[in-house]
Swiss-Prot record:
Subunit structure: Part of the 30S ribosomal subunit. Contacts proteins S8 and S17. May interact with IF1 in the 30S initiation complex.
Residue list for modification 3-methylthioaspartic acid: 89
Keyword tRNA-binding: yes
Organism of provenance: Syntrophobacter fumaroxidans (strain DSM 10017 / MPOB)
PROSITE patterns given in the database record: RIBOSOMAL_S12
Protein name listed in UniProt: Small ribosomal subunit protein uS12
GO molecular function per UniProt: rRNA binding; structural constituent of ribosome; tRNA binding
InterPro entries linked: NA-bd_OB-fold, Ribosomal_uS12, Ribosomal_uS12_bac
UniProt-listed NCBIfam families: rpsL_bact (TIGR00981)
UniProt keyword terms in alphabetical order: Methylation, Ribonucleoprotein, Ribosomal protein, RNA-binding, rRNA-binding, tRNA-binding
Amino acid sequence: MPTINQLVRKGREEIRKKSSTPALQCCPQKRGVCVRVYTTTPKKPNSALRKIARVRLTNGIEVTSYIPGIGHNLQEHSVVLIRGGRVKDLPGVRYHIIRGTLDALGVADRKQGRSKYGTKRPK
């Protein structure tokens, strides 16, 4: 335990919170170009083919991001917007692609929760 004098000289060091999305560099979203679009399998109790993309951001960092929703039109060289948010059963996937912006089209035939998948209101 430090003495009063040691605290006066040095003081307590603040515990800094580690960012869960360091590649965004404190921005809410970042633009990037798809380098590779592929599927992968989730961790132990779950089973599926999850759609993910390797994205090179405008700041030069390359990240793995998840493509939400059913069906997508992304391929290599597609320009996408990514946001933070991890996928629990995919290790190393810390970002989501935002549907309905830039080259990522919204989910077709989506009726509920449309704003999250970039779908316009059906007529």
